[in-house]
C-alpha cells in the first residue's frame, strides 16, 4: 500500500510558463491482450476572452488539467482511504464500496458522454487539449489500473483483516457441509422462485442485460444430443448481496445460485458458469419545450435509459474465451471495454458488510447537537426558531450541527404555525420517508400557500422525485419543475409569517440538499435569517422560478446562470486592485469541483499579480497550482474522510473588509451555465470570521489533506516530518462540538 507522504517527500516537477505553453497531458493507450463528488457530461469548449486578460498577456496553452484524469485521481484518493490501515476496518470496506459505486457512475455518465461525442463526430478538444478519443483511451488504461488496485486491496488486505475480526467473506467451496445445507434450504424457498433462466438458441434471442445487473453466463449440455447451449441467469437485485451462511460467515449470493444451477436446468449437464456485469449509458437526455409536460417526458426517458448502449463489461478473470467472445459479440462492446477481475464482482455489495453492527470497527459514534442559538437553555421544550431568528442570524455547519433540530424543525414549525401564510421550498434530492415532504404536505392541508420547486432531473433520483412531486400535488401544494433547459440546484427555503400588522420573511440558504439522512454524512453549511433583503431576494427568485419574472439582479444573492460567474470573477479581479494598492487581499474557495475555465483563469491572473489564492476542493480540479510565472501563489488541497465535504464557500480579503459567500454552486459549466444556483453574502462579522477560520484550518499545513502539484499529481500529507499524524479537521470539529454543544462558529 502507498504510505502517506510527509511534506518533505512532496517533490513535484516545476514546469515553467514556457513549458506549459507547449504541454499537453500524456495519453496512454489501453493495453488489452485479447480482450469512476458531482459527475456531468460537461464538455464545453473554452476560449479566453479579451476582457478576462485584464490588460495582461494571454495565458499559456496547457494550463488546464484534464478533468477526467482529475476525477480518476479523486476516486484514487477514496481508494487510498480504503488502503490506509489507520482507517477503521469496516470503514475501509465502506470506502471500497464507495470507490466501486463512484466508478459505476463515472462510466454511466462521463465515459458514455465521450463515446456519444465520438460516435456523433463532435470531436472538439477539451480545455486540457485532448481529443475525446485520447481521453477515452486514457480512461480505459487508468481505470484498469485502479480497478486492479481496488481488487487487490479487497483480496489481499481488507478481506483477510475482516476474517481476523470474525467477519469471513467466503466462497461456496469454503463452506462447511452444514452451511451449504442451510443455504440450499434458503435457495429453495427464497431464491429459486424469483430466478428466470434464459436460454440462447435460434428460438430464444440473446436476452437484454440491464445496466449494473449481476449475471451468470451458464454453459449446459444436452446429454441426449450432446449439444452445448448458452443461458443467462440474472441475480435478482432485491436479494441481499452477501448471505449469512452461519454467524460471521458471508457468501456472495451468486455463489449460492451457481451451486444450484442443476435446479434451474433439470436434465441438463451444467458444464461451466461465469459471473459478468454490464454498465450502460444511463445519462438522461430530455428535450424540453414550453408546451411539454416535463414529468411525462422524464418518465419516458427513464424507460429509454434501460436501453442505453454498453460502456463497460466486467467479467471474472477465469471466464472461458468462447463465452467471453459470445458476450462481446452479442453486447456489441469493444475489447478495450472488457475488464477481467478476480471475483466477486460488484464490490458495492460491501455496503452490506459495513452495516454489520460492530461499532469498534467503525468511526466512533457522533450525535450532532442542537445549535446553541436555537437550543432552549435548561428546557425540554422545542425551541422557537422564529424568535431566535428575530434576534440574530444562525450559521449552521452540518453534520456538526443537527439538521433535524435546525432546518427540519424550521419547516416543521412553519407548517404547524397558524401565523405562517406561505412556504416556498426547493427540493433537489430528498429521502423516501422525508419529514421535509411531510411538513410541506401538512402545511398545504392546513390551508397555507405552499410552493415546491421539485428538480425531477436530479441524476439517479429522478424516479423518487417524480413520486414525491405527485404526492405533493395531491396534497394541494403548488408544484413546479423550474425553468426550461435549466436544473434547479439552489438550496432555498422561504417562510412568510404574519406578525401583527406586518409580514416577516424567514429564509434558509444552504449548500446541501434537504435530506435528513445525508445531512448526517455530508458536510454542509446553511444560513437561517430573518433579514428583509434575503427574504426579498428569495421572493424574487421563487417568482422567477414559478412564473415569468425576468429579474436578474439581487441584493444579497449571486444567482446562476446570469450573475454568479461574473460576480465571482469580478471579485477576484478586485482583489488584484486591492493588492496593488497595498490593502489586504486574498481569495479562498471551497468547492466540490474546480473546472470552470473563466474562474480558473481569474485565479491565475490573481496569482500573477501576487494575490494568495487557496482552493479547497473535494473532487475534480482543472487548475494547476505552483507553476512559476502563472500560479506560484495558488495552493490546492483536498480533504476526504468520514464525512463527504460538500459545502461551497467563497471568501475575499476585500481590502480589509472581508466578503464571504456560501451556497450551492460548484465551479463547473453545468452549475454556472445550465443550473439555477444561488450564493448568499454572509454579513455577520462573527460568521465571516468563523468561515475564514474554517478555510484557514482546512488549508493549513498542519491539517491532514492531499496536496495538488503542478503536474496534476496529488500527494497525501497525513504525517509531519517526525512521522506524527497531522490533525484531522473533521475530528477536530467533532471534538469542538463535543466540548461545547452547538456554537455559532464552525
Curated annotation (Swiss-Prot):
Residues annotated as the enzyme's active site: 489 (phosphohistidine intermediate)
Region of interest called Disordered, as start-end residue ranges on this chain: 1-60
EC number: 2.7.4.1
Post-translational modification: An intermediate of this reaction is the autophosphorylated ppk in which a phosphate is covalently linked to a histidine residue through a N-P bond.
A GO term, aspect molecular function: polyphosphate kinase activity
Enzyme class (EC, first level): transferase
A Pfam family per the record: PP_kinase
Cofactor: Mg(2+)
Positions that bind Mg(2+): 429, 459
CDD domains found in the cross-reference section: PLDc_PaPPK1_C1_like, PLDc_PaPPK1_C2_like
Classification via HAMAP family: Polyphosphate_kinase
Family of this protein: Belongs to the polyphosphate kinase 1 (PPK1) family.
Function according to Swiss-Prot or TrEMBL: Catalyzes the reversible transfer of the terminal phosphate of ATP to form a long-chain polyphosphate (polyP).
Protein name: Polyphosphate kinase
Amino acid at each position: 500500500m502507498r504510505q502517506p507522504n510527509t511534506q518533505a517527500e512532496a517533490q513535484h516537477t516545476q514546469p515553467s510558463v514556457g513549458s506549459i505553453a507547449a504541454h499537453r497531458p500524456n495519453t496512454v493507450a489501453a493495453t488489452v491482450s485479447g480482450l469512476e463528488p458531482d459527475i456531468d457530461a460537461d464538455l464545453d469548449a473554452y476560449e479566453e476572452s479579451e476582457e478576462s486578460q485584464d490588460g495582461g498577456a494571454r495565458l499559456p496553452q496547457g494550463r488546464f488539467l484534464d478533468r477526467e484524469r482529475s476525477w480518476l485521481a479523486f476516486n484514487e484518493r477514496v481508494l487510498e482511504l480504503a488502503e490506509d490501515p489507520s482507517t477503521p476496518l469496516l470503514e475501509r470496506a465502506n470506502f471500497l464500496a464507495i470507490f466501486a459505486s463512484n466508478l459505476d457512475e463515472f462510466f454511466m455518465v462521463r465515459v458514455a458522454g465521450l463515446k456519444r461525442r465520438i460516435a456523433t463526430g463532435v470531436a472538439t478538444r477539451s480545455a486540457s487539449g485532448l481529443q475525446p478519443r485520447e481521453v477515452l483511451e486514457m480512461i480505459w488504461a487508468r481505470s484498469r489500473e485502479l480497478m486492479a488496485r481496488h481488487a487487490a486491496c479487497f483480496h489481499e488486505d481488507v478481506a483477510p483483516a475482516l476474517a481476523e475480526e470474525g467477519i469471513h467473506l467466503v466462497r461456496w467451496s469454503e463452506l462447511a457441509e452444514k452451511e451449504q445445507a442451510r443455504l440450499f434450504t434458503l435457495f429453495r424457498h427464497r431464491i429459486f422462485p424469483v430466478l428466470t433462466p434464459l436460454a440462447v438458441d435460434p428460438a430464444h434471442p440473446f436476452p437484454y442485460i440491464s445496466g449494473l445487473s449481476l449475471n451468470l453466463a451458464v454453459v449446459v449440455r444436452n446429454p441426449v444430443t450432446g449439444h452445448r447451449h448458452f443461458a443467462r441467469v440474472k441475480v435478482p437485485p432485491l436479494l441481499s448481496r452477501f448471505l449469512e451462511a452461519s454467524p460471521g460467515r458471508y457468501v456472495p449470493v451468486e455463489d449460492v445460485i451457481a451451486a444450484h444451477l442443476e435446479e434451474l436446468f433439470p436434465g441438463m449437464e451444467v458444464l461451466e458458469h461465469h459471473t459478468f456485469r454490464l454498465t450502460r449509458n444511463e445519462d438522461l437526455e430530455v428535450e424540453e419545450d414550453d408546451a411539454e409536460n416535463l414529468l411525462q417526458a422524464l418518465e419516458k426517458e427513464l424507460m429509454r435509459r434501460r436501453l442505453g448502449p454498453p460502456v463497460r463489461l466486467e467479467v471474472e478473470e477465469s471466464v472461458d474465451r468462447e463465452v467471453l467472445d459470445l458476450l462481446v459479440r452479442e453486447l456489441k462492446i469493444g475489447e478495450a471495454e472488457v475488464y477481467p477481475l478476480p471475483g466477486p464482482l460488484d464490490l458495492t455489495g460491501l455496503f452490506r458488510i459495513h452495516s454489520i453492527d460492530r461499532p469498534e470497527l467503525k468511526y466512533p459514534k457522533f450525535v450532532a447537537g442542537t445549535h446553541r442559538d436555537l437550543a432552549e437553555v435548561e428546557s425540554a421544550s422545542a425551541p422557537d426558531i422564529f424568535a431566535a431568528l428575530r434576534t440574530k442570524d444562525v450559521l449552521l455547519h452540518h453534520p456538526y450541527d443537527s439538521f433535524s433540530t435546525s432546518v427540519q424543525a424550521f419547516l416543521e414549525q412553519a407548517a404547524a404555525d397558524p401565523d405562517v401564510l406561505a412556504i416556498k421550498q426547493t427540493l433537489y434530492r430528498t429521502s423516501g420517508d422525508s419529514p421535509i415532504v411531510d411538513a410541506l404536505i401538512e402545511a398545504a392541508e392546513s390551508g397555507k400557500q405552499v410552493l415546491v420547486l421539485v428538480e425531477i432531473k436530479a441524476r439517479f433520483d429522478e424516479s423518487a422525485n417524480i413520486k414525491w412531486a405527485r404526492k405533493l400535488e395531491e396534497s394541494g401544494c403548488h408544484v413546479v419543475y423550474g425553468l426550461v433547459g435549466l436544473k434547479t440546484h439552489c438550496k432555498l427555503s422561504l417562510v412568510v409569517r404574519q406578525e401583527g400588522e406586518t409580514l416577516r420573511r424567514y429564509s434558509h440558504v444552504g449548500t446541501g440538499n434537504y435530506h435528513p439522512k445525508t445531512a448526517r454524512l455530508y458536510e454542509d453549511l446553511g444560513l437561517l435569517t430573518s433579514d428583509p433583503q434575503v427574504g426579498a431576494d428569495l421572493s424574487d427568485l421563487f417568482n422567477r422560478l414559478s412564473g415569468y419574472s425576468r429579474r436578474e439582479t439581487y441584493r444579497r444573492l449571486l444567482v446562476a446562470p446570469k450573475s454568479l460567474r461574473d460576480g465571482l470573477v469580478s471579485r477576484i479581479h478586485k482583489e488584484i486592485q486591492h493588492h496593488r494598492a497595498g490593502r489586504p487581499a486574498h481569495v479562498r474557495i471551497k468547492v466540490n469541483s474546480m473546472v470552470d475555465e473563466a474562474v480558473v483563469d481569474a485565479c491565475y491572473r490573481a496569482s500573477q499579480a501576487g494575490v494568495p489564492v487557496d482552493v479547497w476542493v473535494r473532487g475534480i480540479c482543472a487548475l494547476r497550482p505552483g507553476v512559476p510565472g502563472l500560479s506560484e501563489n495558488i495552493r490546492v488541497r483536498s480533504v476526504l474522510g468520514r464525512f463527504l465535504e460538500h459545502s461551497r464557500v467563497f471568501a475575499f480579503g476585500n481590502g480589509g473588509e472581508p466578503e464571504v459567500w456560501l451556497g450551492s454552486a460548484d465551479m463547473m459549466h453545468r452549475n454556472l451555465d445550465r443550473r439555477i444556483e444561488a450564493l448568499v453574502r454572509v454579513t455577520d462579522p462573527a460568521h465571516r470570521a468563523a468561515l475564514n477560520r474554517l478555510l484557514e484550518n482546512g488549508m493549513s499545513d498542519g491539517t491532514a489533506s492531499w496536496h495538488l502539484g503542478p503536474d496534476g499529481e496529488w500527494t497525501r500529507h497525513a504525517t509531519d516530518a517526525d512521522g506524527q499524524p497531522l490533525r484531522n479537521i473533521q475530528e477536530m470539529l467533532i471534538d469542538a462540538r463535543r466540548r461545547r454543544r452547538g456554537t455559532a462558529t464552525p
